[in-house]
Amino acid sequence: MSEITREDMHIPKIGIVREIIQETPDVKTFRINAPDGSPLFDHMPGQCAMISVPGVGEGMFSIPSSPTNKEYMEFSIKMCGCLTSFLHSIEPGQMVTVRGPLGNHFPVESEFKGKDILVIGGGIGIAPVRSVVKYMLDHREDYGRIDVVYGARSKEDLVYYEEMSKEWPKVPNTYVHLTIDREQGGWDGPVGFVPNYVKELNFPTDKTVIMCGPPIMIKFTLAGLMELGFQKEQVYTTMELRMKCGIGKCGRCNIGSKYVCKDGPVFRFDELDELPNEY
């Protein structure tokens, strides 16, 4: 990855939306690159970017695509406000500006190599951790067994369903476990909430865990992992929803002595234990 200066991160890059994929009824994935077709910038798994539309607004989004993909950068966006509603209304060819990469990243090189990895996601929370999975699959020989546990309200709400159910399991030593909250017609897979499903799967406690999802899911999944014998220093999460300006200047991401924009968004849970209970 080439060196990116702080000045580079401050300057918005013009991006063109090349393709839009309808993932679920309220989530779309936008594939964006520069006007000349080149990448907007390099990034690492877990980093974020600020997308702006002049006259509409700007927002912070995780980058769910792998850094090894040099054709385009992906953003999976749930419709939940003015900017996201506008983005859901556009067609390919729309110009946006993108500023990044912002924040730290998952330690895929320094800490994860050679280890068995458990990735846990819920709802749109699968987007920030997808980049980790994609990166590890692109460098499969560097990592041990990969397990992905992902849950959503219904089959229709499972983001990246085709990719996760058909493509990832074809990669050696890679296992995907999908669940939905309630029974529904046409679904013959597991039914139940992610925290309970993780406990049922009863994974060995030598895994490194990466987790992202709704706060209530994270709370009970972490408790379940502790019951199984995992330690908090084994579990990583991302707090990109707390990021605002992206450079630690506005102060709205501050938690105790940390600024999520600068010190995060990726943290281990033992690091979060040292902060005020504001997250």
Predicted stretch roles:
Residues 19, 65, 178-180, 237, ...:
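Structural signal for conserved beta-strand scaffold positions within catalytic alpha/beta enzyme cores
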Residues 3, 82-244:
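FNR/FR-type flavoprotein reductase catalytic core
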Residues 2-94, 153-154:
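Ferredoxin-reductase
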Residues 216, 240-265:
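Local cysteine-cluster metal-coordination motifs and their immediate loop/turn environment
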Residues 120, 267-279:
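Short microdomains enriched in Cys/His and/or Lys/Arg
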